[in-house]
């Protein structure tokens, strides 16, 4: 599985002590405020990944363990639906990473 930072540098190590799960979503170019807040303003559609260290897995069991996902998922990216993404991203922009930009 390929995970990338804004600079497209591959993430080699994930600190499991700081991260209990992750989510991925797609941001449309019309979401200008959110794109600006995560440093992606001016992009087309982009996939983004959120490394979640909020302990949500303990609260509602909705997160998957990163190590398990990386071992079991062979696709270039994992698509999860996370309807609270926008609110979460605006408060935790340091946890949002661009994975893939999709040309229109």
Segments and roles (model prediction):
Residues 2-21, 25-28, 38-104:
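Active-site and NAD+-binding cores of ADP-ribose-processing enzymes
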Residues 34-36:
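Compact nucleic-acid interaction/catalytic patches
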């Amino acid at each position: 599985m390929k995970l990338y930072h804004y600079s497209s540098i591959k993430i080699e190590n994930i600190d499991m002590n700081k991260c209990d799960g992750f989510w991925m979503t797609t941001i449309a170019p019309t979401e200008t405020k959110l794109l600006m807040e995560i440093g992606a303003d001016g992009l087309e559609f982009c996939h983004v990944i959120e490394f979640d260290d909020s302990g949500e897995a303990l609260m509602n069991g909705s997160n998957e363990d990163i190590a398990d996902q990386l071992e079991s998922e062979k696709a270039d990216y994992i698509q999860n639906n996370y309807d609270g993404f926008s609110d979460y991203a605006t408060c935790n922009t340091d946890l949002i990473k661009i994975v893939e930009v999709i040309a229109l």
